[in-house]
């Protein structure tokens, strides 16, 4: 379902799939062979293949990301994209150890929202709120589908069915003052 999120506190938001250039950069920096072989896939196909990875392959991929992230955090000269991804991997791995959702989070666009910023997510778009407090505005519905990073019910196959073909990053919307105090 479509939704708009408005940050109350600083927030980390994951939404859609990173552009292929960023995916390739991350695959190389993290030594993520599981991703290198999938960079050219459509966003929907990439997410589908990651969600359907056998658990033993996912466990190896997660361990590789966590190990690489810890090394990259101490290196100088890494790009902001790689540094932010390393921070994300560490944060998610600590909150949800061993969760396959980490692999999905790794390929998603990371947005940092300041208080008052908002981002619109269309229906069929994978998204997650990693940290922070927000107000969510959405259509009434009971069809929340989860693929990981939660203790709640997960229905990854149903999520795959409703994923949109395009998984672009939303446009960040910043508040503008309309006058004194408004």
Segments and roles (model prediction):
Residues 1-117, 127-182:
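Active-site region of the double-stranded beta-helix
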């Amino acid at each position: 379902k479509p939704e708009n999120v408005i940050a109350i506190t600083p927030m980390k938001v994951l939404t859609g799939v990173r552009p292929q250039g960023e995916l390739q950069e991350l695959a190389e920096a993290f030594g993520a062979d599981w991703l290198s072989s999938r960079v050219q896939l459509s966003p929907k196909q990439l997410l589908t293949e990651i969600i359907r990875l056998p658990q033993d392959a996912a466990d190896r991929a997660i361990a590789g990301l966590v190990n690489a992230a810890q090394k990259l955090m101490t290196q100088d000269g890494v790009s902001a994209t790689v540094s932010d991804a390393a921070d994300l991997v560490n944060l998610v791995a600590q909150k949800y150890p061993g969760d396959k959702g980490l692999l999905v989070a790794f390929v998603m666009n990371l947005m940092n929202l300041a208080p008052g910023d908002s981002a619109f997510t269309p229906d069929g778009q994978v998204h997650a709120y990693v940290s922070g407090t927000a107000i969510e505005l959405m259509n009434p519905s009971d069809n929340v589908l989860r693929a990981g990073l939660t203790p709640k019910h997960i229905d990854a196959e149903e999520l795959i069915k409703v994923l949109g073909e395009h998984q672009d990053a939303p446009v960040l919307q910043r508040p503008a003052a309309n006058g004194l105090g408004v």
